[in-house]
Every structure is written in C-alpha cells, then in structure tokens.
C-alpha cells in the first residue's frame, strides 16, 4: 500500500514530469516518488541557546525518516529569543513570531503537499506556533522539543535566566556585589537548551506530552544529552507510522486532550502564557474552549510539583524524579486525566502510562502525591472586575499578601516603568499599571519580565502589585496580573486609570477592581481618544490590524 496520500499530487502522473525533474536534482530516485514525503520543520538558530542545539535533533530525525523508508524534506522556521529581546522594542515581535512560525509551517507543508511533518523547536513561541500549525492543517505531525538547559551555578546556588533578571534589581538596590552580579550573569546559562524552570517553553512542551502530540519523557530531557537525540529519532519513526495509519492531529487534539494538557500545566505550576496559547491552539483545531475552562480545571487540579519560578527545582530535576509521565500517572489515578484520549503513538494515555509507578519515588522532593499537594487548587486564575470585564490572568498560589489595595502608578510603556522601579520611585503598597501593551496596542503583547524581576530584586515582590494588558514571562511570580481585557488601545477600563486611583487585586475573590465610581468612569470614557497606532508598516502593523483580544488567544486568523 502506498502512503503518499498527499504528495502524489505533486509527484505522480505525466503532468508532474517537470516536478519530478526538480526532485531528481535533489537526489531522488524513481522509487522515491511512491514514498511519503515527511517535512522536518527546523527551528535551529544561533540567535539563542534555546535553539542553538537543535541541528543534532533535526539530523537524527532526518536519518530516522530515511530509515523508515520515507523522504525527509527539511525547511526552516524562525525564532525570537524572548530572554534576549526582553525589556526592549524587540519583545513586541515575540508573540508575533508564534503566528509567523505557524504560517511558515502551514505554507511549506501545504505548498509542497507533504504527507506528514516533524516540528523541531526550542524557544517559547516555537511550541505554540508549531502546534497551532499542526492543529490548523491537520496533517499527521509530531512535536519534538529541543530540550531544557541545565541549571547554572554560582557560589553554591542554582541559577536560571530569571536569576540574572532579578539580579538587576538586587544590584541597583545595593543588595548584591559587583562580583556576584557578574558571577550570576556569566553562569546563569551554562549550556544549550530552553530556560530551565517551569517557564513558558517547558510549560508548553510538558503539556504536549499530556496533549498526546509529543513522546513521553521528551519534554524534560536536557538538550545536550544523547537521550534527547535518541528521542528525536524515535519521534520521527513514530510520525512515519502515524502517516501510515493516517492518524491526524485532530484525532488527538480534542477538548478532552486539551483538558489533560491544562491539568498538567496546573499540576506543575506552569506559565500564564499557556492560557493564551491553548486558546489559540483550540481555535486552530476548531474546539470550543474559553478562559472559563481554565478556571474550571484550576478548581479541581492541585499543584503537586515544586518547580521554579515560585518553587525550588528545575526541569532536569523533574526529569530525574520521573518526568511528566509520573505527574500524569498521579493525575490519572486521581481521576483528573482522561485516560481514553489518543496519542501520536496510536495508544491511549492510559496505555502509555500503564508501566509508570503509581507512587512517586521516595528519594525525590520535586513531585508530591495528590494527598500531599503543595496547593489544593491550581495556580493560574482568571480574574474579573471593572478593570477586566473580559478577564485577566494571574498566578495566585504562594502569595503572602493575596489581597492588595493601593494607589495606581500609571505607565504607558515598559521602559518608563522599569526606570521608575530602578530609581526607587515605586513604594510598598503601590499598584503599577502598565498599559497600551496589548495585542493591538503594544502591539504584540510584550512580556514584562524586566519590571517584575526588578520589583522582586528590589525586595518589593510581596508588597507591590502590577497589572498589564501585556503578558508576563513564564519566569514571573508575585502579585502580578496580565492579559487584561479589554486592552487599553480599544478603550478598556485600564485606559481610564489615573495616577493615584485606588486599585484592588484580590486573589481570594478573583477580583481586579478600579475603585472609582461609575459616573467618574463614564466622564473619563467620554473624554478618552484612541491613540494613533505605534506602527503603520511592517509585521507589527499587520499583527495589530489582525489580532483578536487576549481572551481569544490573540490569534490573527
């Protein structure tokens, strides 16, 4: 039986003789035209350590495709380094790159009639970009995560990239020496691989195991390790089998599968960005999914992993403790996962987990039993109120001060807010408001890791609130609320906040409230005028014109 169900449209018949001529130039032989064409979306880049170690994985996948008697076709996908662009105008391109990556993969796979695709990526937006594409085109596909970085070390302390961001605040506050500042800077990122805590890259890749679109254990492997290369090869072999079975992404990505993925995100203390990305993935798969679904799952799934940014350990520690399959097995046994969901292997979640222990190992402190959960409910909460009629997202577990009411300190750009924090103009009890940074206003919903890390570095992480219509890095923690919708640029209430207004953030009541009476707000709204777009040409202008609100995933189509 021939498995070139799609590629035959470009390789078979008299009319396709010129097409075959071009394939011969690539080294194809006549019998290759009866084999499936397998795309390998290559995210390798020397822009960032997250992607600098991907070529070995791509090479392994290509070899495995050949060994499986199929034709590999590599093509490139771009990446933006969130960590390197953070705090600059370049960060506005980060979320945009999610859409660009999805469009690149769709364009190549559909334009070349590929029969399947192995997507290989590393930095934050690579994962949702790739999964959006797979859900959208519904061609057999698998995601290969590039793997995590190993932790850095300085004077006996484990480091991640967030350590370097927080060091900026500590150093400017006089709480860190020049030697330690430079020591953290030079040692925070010791290897290739994506940022090491349960930040956005590890959050999304971990969830893909539960979604059924990546192989078990693959998300917590370190990029430099041989097992990561071996996993990439196995992923390619599994993908070729999926092509033969005609097992497609939408056979796997169902509403129940997304519930599984989000349950793992809650259990591991994952990134707020996952809310935005799963709204987008569900949209691409044409699945009914809303921010209320996250809140529904939060209320029933506990946090059972002690992982950075709010915890102690990193992804390599989680891997040694049993990885995501151990987390999934605990959730499955507690009735918190759908065991009948299909995976890319052709087996169900329950079948995949049958040999995983029901109890985590006693010699580790990363994964806790359900009855010893760190928090009885999930950490990613949807807040609402007159400041966020359409919702906002916050991490609410582990807060020493879960309720804050304080004066608004209003900034219409990130740089002026960061300067105020570093210049000690922000005091305990303040609520920093960062606005005009949403999907349309930013544009691109840049992440606010620089100001939030500076607040923590200044020792104000438990006493200062921060709200924004932009996003937060997966490395952010503290009393911070993002994804405020409607955003300021379209006239959301956040646009009406004035310096000194009283704002309440209440993690118990899931409330985000501007304490100004309705009559005054109506007066301000009548006087408000939409600002001119920050960009009128180029990709940011295109994104601003097409982007939907944050509570709809900030998608463009």
Swiss-Prot record:
Signal peptide: none annotated. The lineage of its organism: Bacteria, Pseudomonadati, Pseudomonadota, Betaproteobacteria, Burkholderiales. This is Dihydroxy-acid dehydratase. Its EC number is 4.2.1.9. Pathway: Amino-acid biosynthesis; L-isoleucine biosynthesis; L-isoleucine from 2-oxobutanoate: step 3/4; Amino-acid biosynthesis; L-valine biosynthesis; L-valine from pyruvate: step 3/4. Keywords: 2Fe-2S, Amino-acid biosynthesis, Branched-chain amino acid biosynthesis, Iron, Iron-sulfur, Lyase, Magnesium, Metal-binding. The keyword Disulfide bond does not apply. [2Fe-2S] cluster binds at residues 50, 123, 195. The keyword Transferase does not apply. Disulfide bonds: none annotated. Its cofactor is [2Fe-2S] cluster; Mg(2+). The modification N6-carboxylysine is found at residue 125. Functions in the biosynthesis of branched-chain amino acids. Catalyzes the dehydration of (2R,3R)-2,3-dihydroxy-3-methylpentanoate (2,3-dihydroxy-3-methylvalerate) into 2-oxo-3-methylpentanoate (2-oxo-3-methylvalerate) and of (2R)-2,3-dihydroxy-3-methylbutanoate (2,3-dihydroxyisovalerate) into 2-oxo-3-methylbutanoate (2-oxoisovalerate), the penultimate precursor to L-isoleucine and L-valine, respectively. GO terms for molecular function: 2 iron, 2 sulfur cluster binding; dihydroxy-acid dehydratase activity; magnesium ion binding. InterPro entries: DHAD_IlvD/Edd, Dihydro-acid_dehy_C, DihydroxyA_deHydtase, DiOHA_6PGluconate_deHydtase_CS, ILV_EDD_C, ILV_EDD_N, IlvD/EDD_N. The gene is ilvD.
């Amino acid at each position: 039986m021939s498995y070139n169900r799609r590629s035959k449209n470009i390789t078979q018949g008299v009319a396709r003789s010129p097409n075959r001529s071009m394939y011969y130039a690539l080294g194809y032989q006549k019998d290759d035209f009866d084999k499936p064409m397998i795309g390998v979306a290559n995210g390798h880049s020397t822009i960032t350590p997250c992607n600098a170690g991907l070529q070995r994985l791509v090479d392994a996948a290509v070899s495995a495709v050949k060994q499986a008697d199929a034709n590999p076709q590599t093509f490139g996908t771009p990446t933006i380094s969130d960590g390197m662009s953070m705090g600059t105008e370049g960060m506005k391109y980060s979320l945009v790159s999610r859409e660009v990556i999805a469009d690149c993969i769709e364009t190549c796979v559909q334009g070349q009639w590929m029969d399947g695709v192995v997507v290989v990526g590393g930095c934050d937006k690579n994962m949702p970009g790739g999964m959006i594409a797979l859900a959208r085109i519904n061609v057999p596909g698998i995601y290969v995560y590039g793997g995590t970085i190993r932790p850095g070390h300085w004077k006996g302390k484990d480091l991640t990239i967030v350590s370097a961001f927080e060091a900026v605040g500590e150093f400017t506050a006089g709480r860190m020496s020049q030697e330690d500042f430079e020591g953290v800077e030079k040692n925070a990122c010791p290897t290739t691989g994506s940022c090491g805590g349960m930040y956005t890259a590890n959050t999304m890749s971990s969830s893909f195991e539960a979604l059924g679109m990546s192989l078990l254990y693959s998300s917590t492997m370190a990029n430099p390790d041989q097992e990561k290369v071996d996993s990439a090869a196995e992923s390619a072999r599994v993908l070729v089998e999926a092509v033969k079975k005609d097992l497609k992404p939408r056979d796997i990505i169902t509403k129940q599968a997304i519930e599984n993925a989000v349950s793992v995100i809650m259990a591991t203390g994952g990134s707020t960005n996952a809310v935005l990305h799963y709204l987008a993935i569900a949209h691409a798969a044409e699945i009914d999914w809303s921010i209320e679904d996250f809140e529904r799952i939060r209320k029933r799934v506990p946090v059972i992993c002690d992982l950075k940014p709010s915890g102690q350990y990193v992804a390599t520690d989680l891997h040694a403790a049993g990885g995501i399959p151990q987390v999934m097995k605990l959730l499955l046994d507690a009735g918190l996962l759908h065991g009948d969901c299909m995976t890319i292997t052709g087996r169900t979640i329950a079948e995949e987990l049958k040999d995983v222990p029901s109890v985590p190992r006693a010699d580790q402190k990363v994964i806790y039993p359900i009855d010893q959960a760190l928090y009885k409910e999930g950490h990613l909460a949807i807040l609402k109120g007159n400041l966020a009629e359409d919702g906002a997202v916050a991490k609410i577990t582990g807060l020493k001060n879960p309720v804050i009411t304080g004066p608004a300190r209003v900034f219409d750009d990130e740089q002026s807010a960061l300067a105020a924090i570093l210049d000690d103009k922000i005091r305990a009890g303040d609520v920093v408001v960062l606005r005009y940074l949403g999907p349309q206003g930013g544009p691109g919903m840049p992440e606010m890791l620089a100001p939030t890390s500076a607040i923590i570095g200044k020792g104000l992480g438990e006493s200062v609130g921060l709200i924004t219509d932009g996003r937060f890095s997966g490395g952010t923690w503290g009393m911070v609320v993002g994804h405020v919708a409607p955003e300021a640029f379209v006239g959301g209430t956040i646009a009406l906040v004035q310096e000194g207004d009283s704002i309440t953030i209440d993690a118990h009541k899931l409330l985000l409230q501007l304490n100004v009476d309705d009559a005054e707000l109506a007066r301000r709204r009548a006087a408000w005028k939409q600002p001119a777009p920050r960009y009128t040409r180029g990709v940011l202008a295109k994104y601003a014109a097409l982007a939907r609100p944050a509570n709809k995933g900030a998608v463009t189509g």
